[in-house]
Amino acid sequence: MSAFTPASEVLLRHSDDFEQSRILFAGDLQDDLPARFESAASRVHTQQFHHWQLLSQLMGEKARFSLVAHADDVADCDTLIYYWPKNKPEAQFQLMNILSLLPLGTDIFVVGENRSGVRSAEQMLADYAPLNKIDSARRCGLYHGRLEKQPVFDAEKYWGEYRINDLTIKTLPGVFSRDGLDVGSQLLLSTLTPHTKGKVLDVGCGAGVLSAALASHSPKVRLTLCDVSAPAVEASRATLAANGVEGEVFASNVFSDVKGRFDMIISNPPFHDGIQTSLDAAQTLIHGAVRHLNSGGELRIVANAFLPYPKVLDETFGFHEVIAQTGRFKVYRTVMTRQAKK
């Protein structure tokens, strides 16, 4: 994370203006600029565990990870620099949360790539911190305003839910498949047979759909779920609770905080980090699975058919098989054997 994103490069064009500022950085933080930016003081609040991992190493307690920011997360800040995400409801949740905590008169800066929809910030903040565009470069926009009115923020109002057969799925802004079951997960679910037993790890659990569905026909399964996203972790906990399913749910950057071995690892791994394309998580998942599968344990993932996962599976496990496919997606299966590269 040493190279700066285009959004950060636009901010650096104005770095002299921030030397006396006490800044809170938030939003879609994709680099370590908050730790390297010259200012009177800098803090970070992020909902992404992998971003917190990096920034906390550089900033210590000044970097915070949670679903909702609290007053002590923004203490003494007189400036907000918000990186616009690709997901508008996610931006709404985060900005309303943070603006409800900051004092009137706080300088508000919003920066993001044009393709992320950063222009939407003007309308979203019109009643609270009217924005003006102050720079346009690197296919990004930078907006500035001052906080004139604090919004009232109630996290409970952002919860949503939908049903899959007899299951209730709880969701929050920023969670994958927030509005319904995605086609890839649906294909993976179709391959999970009833009466599965043993310990199952759901990596990148999102709203907890895969685990809740698996538990509905395999009640003896022991579930562990993890995700880098704070909204996903909370949504998965709520989904399990809504369906009377037990399981451990926690934040982890793929396997970073996972302990022990499992009989099955299931995942619909992301190939986007924010608006950037990234295969890192899936490759880390495949390579790392050998250290978290019992002998004879199985890795089962769904992915877009065009992604180069067969090669990585073969290099790591020695083989793979495709057990279901559509025109767009494939479900890959491989098994932990002696030939797997530990």
Swiss-Prot record:
What Pfam families does the entry give?
MTS (PF05175), MTS_N (PF08468)
Q: Which reaction does it catalyse?
A: guanosine(1207) in 16S rRNA + S-adenosyl-L-methionine = N(2)-methylguanosine(1207) in 16S rRNA + S-adenosyl-L-homocysteine + H(+)
Q: Where in the cell is it found?
A: Cytoplasm
Top-rank taxon, per record: Bacteria
Q: Does the keyword Cell membrane apply?
A: no
Catalytic activity, EC: 2.1.1.172
What InterPro entries does this protein's entry cite? DNA_methylase_N6_adenine_CS, Mtase_sm_N, rRNA_ssu_MeTfrase_C, RsmC/RlmG, SAM-dependent_MTases_sf, Small_mtfrase_dom
Task: Extract the GO molecular function terms from the UniProt entry.
Answer: 16S rRNA (guanine(1207)-N(2))-methyltransferase activity; nucleic acid binding
Broad class of the protein's primary localization: cytoplasm
Keywords, A to Z, come to: Cytoplasm, Methyltransferase, rRNA processing, S-adenosyl-L-methionine, Transferase
Its GO CC terms are: cytoplasm
Q: What class of enzyme is it?
A: transferase
Quaternary structure note? Monomer.
Q: What does this protein do?
A: Specifically methylates the guanine in position 1207 of 16S rRNA in the 30S particle.
Which family does the entry's similarity section mention? Belongs to the methyltransferase superfamily. RsmC family.
HAMAP family the UniProt entry points to: 16SrRNA_methyltr_C
Instruction: Return the PANTHER family for the record.
Output: RIBOSOMAL RNA SMALL SUBUNIT METHYLTRANSFERASE C
Protein name per UniProt:
Ribosomal RNA small subunit methyltransferase C
Task: Tell me which species this is from.
Answer: Citrobacter koseri (strain ATCC BAA-895 / CDC 4225-83 / SGSC4696)
